Amino acid sequence: MTADNALYIPPYKADDQDVVVELNTHFGAEAFTAQPTRTGMPVLWVERARLFEILTFLRNVPKPYSMLYDLHGVDERLRTNRRGLPGADFTVFYHLLSIERNSDVMIKVALSESDLSVPTITSIWPNANWYEREVWDMFGIDFPGHPHLSRIMMPPTWEGHPLRKDFPARATELDPYSLTLAKQQLEEEAARFRPEDWGMKRSGANEDYMFLNLGPNHPSAHGAFRIILQLDGEEIVDCVPDIGYHHRGAEKMAERQSWHSFIPYTDRIDYLGGVMNNLPYVLSVEKLAGIKVPEKVDVIRIMMAEFFRITSHLLFLGTYIQDVGAMTPVFFTFTDRQKAYTVIEAITGFRLHPAWYRIGGVAHDLPRGWEKLVKDFVDWLPKRLDEYTKAALQNSILKGRTVGVAAYNTKEALEWGVTGAGLRSTGCDFDLRKARPYSGYENFEFEVPLAANGDAYDRCMVRVEEMRQSIKIIDQCMRNMPEGPYKADHPLTTPPPKERTLQHIETLITHFLQVSWGPVMPANESFQMIEATKGINSYYLTSDGGTMSYRTRIRTPSYPHLQQIPSVIKGSMVADLIAYLGSIDFVMADVDR
């Protein structure tokens, strides 16, 4: 890291600094190599031989790091700006989160290409299972001791590991694809479920089990998603979620797009989240660039993000009630979504995927008359939410299908990496907009809805109350919108203000280069998490000092939420699974990326 870059590195929070002191005291400072980054958290490299005991210590320390927030890898072989870092061909990183401390720490381990293996940590955090499978799938890194190390995103017949730097990034770099009859039969056979591979028995002491495919094309699966159910009659003995059907290689595409041109791709992660997807990405890029946006930009971003929180929750509400048998409410919620999209389209020019946030600002200023459109919606929705609560959510049939169904507690939620409404429905008061305010959320008055039972019904009610709080936030944005520019006055703001290109040739040249070639970001690492529609979403960016990201890690909330399914639904009925799936509120693009 260069000295100039180090000037922008923020100090750790007190709680983050405390864990560094605890680690140094217990293991000795020589056990760690600290990496200065712009992630805002301690990043510590450790030897592979000590990784397991260090992670175990963090899992059991007072005020523990109860959540394995993320685990993934980096191919370091082409990275040029690595001064001061341990030698590595590949890196595996472990991002840990402590709710009690409101603290993060990242542990990294360096690997050589000749010895790509790290001990599994599934005995410490159960949600490491899928993350380790994905790292093996994408990079070919082995995890000895893993219960079932197999492909998870790519088909079982896939050859190669796509996130390696020597793996082609475009279809034109591969041989033409053809599907012969023999190959089709091979693919079909590879998809066959074999219970023995997953430690399941085909029969018990007095019964034969039935194995049922739910999906990958089933309306209650909410996307291309398969769950193989082991059934004893209607009772679910065990199940295996099968994902990856929607995988498009979003993290690989980020390595071939400029920092600016990748923004539209973020919209397609949680495709119901709209600009909510743009926010963690542009905030992370702005950390790399050292950009501080004007106050007006913060308020506009918050207002539009909350609009998309509402549209996403309205879709959830209508389809969830439909999943348990009530057909009418979905038409009402779609009417309300249309009213929201009328406002969104008037402001951004688009509906579902505006790709409207920019590095350093937003695409353009608010249009004339935007206040009336926003006010009309703010006045409209609360009365509709009252109707939904009275007519549908207090319905005895819906309650009978959801109260006490698929319940889990805070401890279980944290162990599986659950965030958002799923975590808060257990009574855990953790909302990033309050706990770690970003983009100026600390300037707004709103409450964090909580529940106590952690069941399917509570998850629904938390989201309904979140819509009420979003309305309060939008109303405050409307009433207190600051004056000022909609883009930061910074050399790396992309694109720079258009009006200046008509007056200054230097600005015109910069505009041309940044749009066509892309802005050059300082070599460093940055990270930003936000409270998205489905839970916590984050972007962890690695810049090698170029116009494109060296590595973009997209951590989505829906991924761990689906991994949790077997632990929650065993012993329940198939009908309970349908109610549970609806209450999770996921989209498969958010899972598969």
UniProtKB/Swiss-Prot annotation:
GO molecular function: NAD binding; NADH dehydrogenase (ubiquinone) activity; NADH:ubiquinone reductase (non-electrogenic) activity; quinone binding
Membrane-spanning residues: none
Assigned EC number: 7.1.1.-
Cited InterPro entries: NADH_DH_suC, NADH_DH_suCD, NADH_Q_OxRdtase_suD, NADH_quin_OxRdtase_su_C/D-like, NADH_UbQ_OxRdtase_30kDa_su, NADH_UbQ_OxRdtase_49kDa_CS, NDH1_su_D/H, NiFe-Hase_large
Keywords, in A-Z order: Cell inner membrane, Cell membrane, Membrane, Multifunctional enzyme, NAD, Quinone, Translocase, Transport, Ubiquinone
Chief site of localization: membrane
Region annotation NADH dehydrogenase I subunit C: where it falls in the sequence: 1-184
Positions of the UniProt region annotated as NADH dehydrogenase I subunit D: 208-593
Membrane topology note: Peripheral membrane protein
Pfam families in the cross-refs: Complex1_30kDa (PF00329), Complex1_49kDa (PF00346)
Catalytic activity annotation: a quinone + NADH + 5 H(+)(in) = a quinol + NAD(+) + 4 H(+)(out)
GO cellular component, one term: NADH dehydrogenase complex
Subcellular location: Cell inner membrane
Annotated family: In the N-terminal section; belongs to the complex I 30 kDa subunit family.
NCBIfam families: NuoC_fam, NuoD, PRK06075.1, PRK11742.1
Protein function: NDH-1 shuttles electrons from NADH, via FMN and iron-sulfur (Fe-S) centers, to quinones in the respiratory chain. The immediate electron acceptor for the enzyme in this species is believed to be ubiquinone. Couples the redox reaction to proton translocation (for every two electrons transferred, four hydrogen ions are translocated across the cytoplasmic membrane), and thus conserves the redox energy in a proton gradient.
Subunit structure: NDH-1 is composed of 13 different subunits. Subunits NuoB, CD, E, F, and G constitute the peripheral sector of the complex.
Name of this protein: NADH-quinone oxidoreductase subunit C/D
Gene (UniProt): nuoC
